[in-house]
Amino acid sequence: MVGRLSLQDVPELVDAKKKGDGVLDSPDSGLPPSPSPSHWGLAAGGGGGERAAAPGTLEPDAAAATPAAPSPASLPLAPGCALRLCPLSFGEGVEFDPLPPKEVRYTSLVKYDSERHFIDDVQLPLGLAVASCSQTVTCVPNGTWRNYKAEVRFEPRHRPTRFLSTTIVYPKYPKAVYTTTLDYNCRKTLRRFLSSVELEAAELPGSDDLSDEC
């Protein structure tokens, strides 16, 4: 699944075109091209300002003190089983300047089931209104990923300082929940685009039966 927020009169993201080559761009991965975590990790470190840690992540000191869990790829496999990386979660963030004085939040919830549908929820303070909101969800039959595209226009048109997107794909379960949050952070002044894809190893019986089950 690909998440993207399109806002009018927003300058092009810094180094967005330079981050197209990632380690997950292989056609066999089943995922569309996405920036490599190593690229945005370096960009965040050299941006010249501090960045708050993402929800659920550890600070560098805490991460160093916490023992790392053994990788599933390093565990012994039973005969006839093969490991395959399946999408576990997807997240991205965007920060812009100037900063608005009040918070604006845009939440989108997409549910996939037998009757494909999605729910939109826009929360705005007094004095702000949505000029237009459009959303398109494309489900690819017999595929391992979906296309997601959303466009929101606010009046008055404030530029977002931060955009967070998270997607969780449940293995072997034909339902995915996609939640998007757009909010303002008055303490941030940098313009960034961050994208990451988290994968976990799954055991499949037989290396020849690598179907699109994840």
UniProtKB/Swiss-Prot annotation:
Its main location: cytoplasm. Residues 1-56 are annotated as: Disordered. One of its GO terms (cellular component) is cytoplasm. The modification Phosphoserine is found at residues 6, 26. It is found in: Cytoplasm, Cytoskeleton. Pfam families: FAM101. One of its GO terms (molecular function) is filamin binding. InterPro entries: Refilin (IPR028215). Keywords: Cytoplasm, Cytoskeleton, Phosphoprotein. The keyword Nucleotide-binding does not apply. One of its GO terms (biological process) is skeletal system morphogenesis. The keyword Transmembrane does not apply. PANTHER family: PTHR31848, REFILIN-B (PTHR31848:SF2). Involved in the regulation of the perinuclear actin network and nuclear shape through interaction with filamins. Plays an essential role in the formation of cartilaginous skeletal elements. Interacts with FLNA and FLNB. Belongs to the Refilin family. This is Refilin-B. The lineage of its organism: Eukaryota, Metazoa, Chordata, Craniata, Vertebrata.
